[in-house]
């Protein structure tokens, strides 16, 4: 089955257009001040009209409080909220009840035991996102351009959509699809020429690689 594709950390109309024209199913806006891909709410609001259904907008947040989430939702109107911090199951349940939007919960993976916390979120979220654990000293929970052992996902027994993130690019995405069989591929730094700067050719190349991998 061909995985869906999420392009994350887009900041310009040109990059958004190329991603959508090539078949992106999800566009991710990042609301985290420490990230080179961060957008202000006003910037995101200006870009929002470029994303039309059936493409869905994902608001990526890191331990955001209710006030910030309320502002994002009121102004940017995302279709989905991604929680990429240390949000507890109780926090996720609160956010789901408060805002009523589908939720993606990100988990940082390096080894098999890192999957242990996933079970506590069963039934609370709509998608599980698995990213490589950030290197020591990094201020970014994601978008670091590193991957984890994708074969670990084969042991996951969860009735929930899986999103594979971390270190994906045009060169390795075929292998990632073969090994992990994710429902959704999530790429950010793998289509950048510099941190936070998306490259049109790299975006196009990634989609071409996914197409070839699925056809073979």
Tell me what each language-model feature is:
Residues 1-184, 189-216:
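Conserved N-terminal beta1-alpha1 strand-loop-helix module at the mouth
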């Amino acid at each position: 089955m061909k995985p869906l594709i999420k392009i994350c950390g887009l900041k310009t109309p040109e990059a958004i257009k190329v991603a959508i024209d090539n078949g992106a199913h999800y566009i991710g806006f990042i609301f985290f001040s420490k990230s080179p891909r961060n957008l202000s709410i006003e910037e995101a609001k200006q870009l929002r009209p470029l994303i039309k259904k059936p493409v869905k907008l994902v608001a990526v947040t890191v331990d955001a409080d209710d006030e910030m989430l309320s502002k994002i939702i009121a102004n940017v109107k995302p279709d989905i909220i991604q929680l990429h911090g240390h949000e507890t199951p109780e926090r996720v349940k609160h956010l789901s009840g408060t805002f009523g939007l589908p939720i993606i919960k990100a988990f940082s993976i390096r080894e098999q035991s890192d999957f242990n916390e996933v079970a506590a979120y069963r039934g609370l979220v709509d998608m599980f996102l698995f990213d490589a654990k950030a290197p020591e000293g990094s201020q970014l929970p994601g978008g670091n351009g590193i991957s984890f052992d994708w074969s670990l996902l084969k042991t996951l027994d969860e009735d929930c959509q899986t999103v594979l993130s971390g270190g994906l690019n045009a060169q390795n995405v075929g292998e990632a699809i073969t090994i992990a069989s994710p429902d959704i591929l999530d790429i950010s730094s793998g289509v950048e020429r510099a941190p936070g700067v998306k490259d049109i050719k790299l975006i196009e190349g990634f989609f071409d690689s996914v197409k070839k991998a699925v056809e073979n």
